[in-house]
């Protein structure tokens, strides 16, 4: 039997089968018979040859796939590059907008606008009190529908939205309900008057409200606490009885505010609010509060932490502090309502009380402008002195400046 000849140096670029030779095995001699393929050595050599070419084709296939991946890789990189570029462009646009908003020019314009509106509001309010007191409730309503949505928007953006659930906002809504829905309700009038002249008015002192014309936030806080008693002062003491008879009949029915009845009505309303506040805020939003969302309780705890009452509350167990705060807030509300009969029965006392509260906010505003701006200017001056002191050539100027 002739030996099977196998070409081991066959070019790997060719196919295993020769297309122009009736599918004969490439690399085998044509003289080999078909029966010779069943010889054991020849079978092994054929197998080796097939295995070698299989591995070569497998390598070529992997190389082709790898080459296609390499071709697609630049496209993939280009897509990632364009995506990152788009993200960067959007980020820069947002940063640019934020920078423009916080820039000195925009802030100055915003402060100027706020200052102009604040001064104009004070002047218009004074004119209405003196010339058209029967229109004060309209002026109050217009401002309330401006300030409350603005307060909700700004506080929600800052994470202060739980302050909106405070008793002061309920007091304003209650007064709005009395003015426009139930002006004939005697009990609702007594409740609104007691809360306005009690809790709301004294909150100017407790919350340290300031008359800062350049700050919408400060003006809003002062409006929420001071305007309700001012509106009721004009209704009770400055409005004609003929107008009251048609528009606010409950005022004429109340000859005087009895302390016991006012405390009883206010206590019932306060209890309803406090129950709602505890379950909706203290319990329902406990996780958010623990994560750092401020409430009136956390703010007052920090603001009065150095006082005797603040230190006493801080020494109590953590789970008891909110309940103690509720009791203190209730006692504060009832205490501030005690002199309401004086304000209601005497026009002069009511005027003096409102002047005192408003003067307190003016003093707080003056303290802010002088102390805060003064300290800021002092820091800038100290930084300038330090900069001049670090420059040897300007030592003379530094000493002259320090004098």
From Swiss-Prot:
Bilayer topology? Multi-pass membrane protein
Q: Offer a single GO CC term for the protein.
A: Golgi membrane
Sites carrying a glycan are: 240
Q: Which UniProt keywords apply?
A: Acyltransferase, Endoplasmic reticulum, Glycoprotein, Golgi apparatus, Lipid biosynthesis, Lipid metabolism, Membrane, Phospholipid biosynthesis, Phospholipid metabolism, Transferase, Transmembrane, Transmembrane helix
Where does this protein chiefly localize?
Answer: endoplasmic reticulum
**Topology feature Lumenal, residues:** 134-137, 183-186, 240-262, 344-352
Functional note: Glycerophosphocholine acyltransferase (GPCAT) that utilizes acyl-CoA to acylate glycero-3-phosphocholine (GPC), forming lysophosphatidylcholine (LPC). Shows broad acyl specificities with a preference for 16:0-CoA, polyunsaturated acyl-CoA, and the hydroxylated ricinoleoyl-CoA. Also catalyzes the acylation of glycero-3-phosphoethanolamine (GPE) with acyl-CoA. In addition to acyl-CoA, GPCAT efficiently utilizes LPC and lysophosphatidylethanolamine (LPE) as acyl donors in the acylation of GPC.
Q: What is the name of this protein?
A: Glycerophosphocholine acyltransferase 1
List the source organism: Schizosaccharomyces pombe (strain 972 / ATCC 24843) (Fission yeast)
């Amino acid at each position: 039997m002739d030996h099977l000849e196998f070409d081991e140096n066959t070019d790997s670029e060719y196919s295993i089968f020769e297309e122009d030779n009736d599918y004969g095995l490439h690399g085998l001699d044509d003289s080999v018979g078909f029966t010779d393929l069943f010889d054991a050595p020849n079978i092994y050599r054929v197998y080796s040859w097939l295995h070698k070419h299989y591995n070569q084709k497998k390598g070529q296939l992997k190389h082709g796939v790898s080459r296609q991946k390499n071709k697609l890789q630049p496209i993939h990189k280009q897509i990632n590059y364009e995506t990152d570029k788009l993200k960067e462009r959007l980020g820069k646009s947002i940063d640019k907008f934020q920078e423009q908003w916080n820039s000195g020019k925009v802030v100055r314009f915003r402060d100027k606008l706020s200052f102009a509106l604040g001064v104009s509001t004070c002047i218009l309010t004074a004119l209405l009190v003196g010339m058209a007191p029967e229109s004060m409730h309209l002026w109050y309503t217009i401002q309330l529908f401006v300030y409350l949505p603005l307060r909700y928007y700004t506080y929600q953006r800052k994470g202060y939205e739980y302050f909106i659930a405070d008793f002061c906002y309920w007091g304003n809504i209650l007064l709005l309900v009395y003015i426009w829905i139930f002006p004939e309700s005697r009990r609702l009038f007594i409740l609104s008057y007691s809360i306005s002249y009690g809790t709301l008015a004294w909150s100017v002192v407790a919350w340290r409200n300031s008359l800062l014309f350049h700050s919408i936030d400060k003006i809003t806080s002062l409006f929420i606490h001071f305007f309700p008693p001012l509106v009721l002062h004009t209704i009770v003491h400055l409005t004609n009885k003929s107008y009251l008879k048609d528009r606010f009949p409950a005022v004429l029915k109340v000859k005087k505010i009895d302390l016991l009845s006012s405390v009883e009505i206010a206590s019932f309303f306060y209890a309803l609010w406090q129950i709602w506040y505890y379950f909706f805020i203290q319990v329902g939003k406990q996780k958010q509060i623990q994560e750092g969302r401020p409430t009136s309780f956390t703010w007052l705890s920090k603001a009065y932490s150095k006082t005797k009452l603040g230190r006493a509350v801080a020494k109590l167990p953590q789970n008891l502090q909110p309940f103690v705060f509720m009791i203190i807030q209730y006692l504060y509300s009832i205490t501030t309502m005690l002199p309401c009969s004086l304000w209601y029965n005497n026009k002069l006392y009511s005027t003096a009380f409102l002047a005192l509260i408003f003067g307190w906010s003016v003093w707080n505003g003056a303290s802010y402008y002088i102390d805060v701006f003064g300290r800021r200017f002092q820091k800038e001056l100290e930084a300038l002195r330090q900069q001049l002191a670090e420059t040897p050539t300007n030592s003379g100027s530094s000493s002259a400046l320090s004098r």
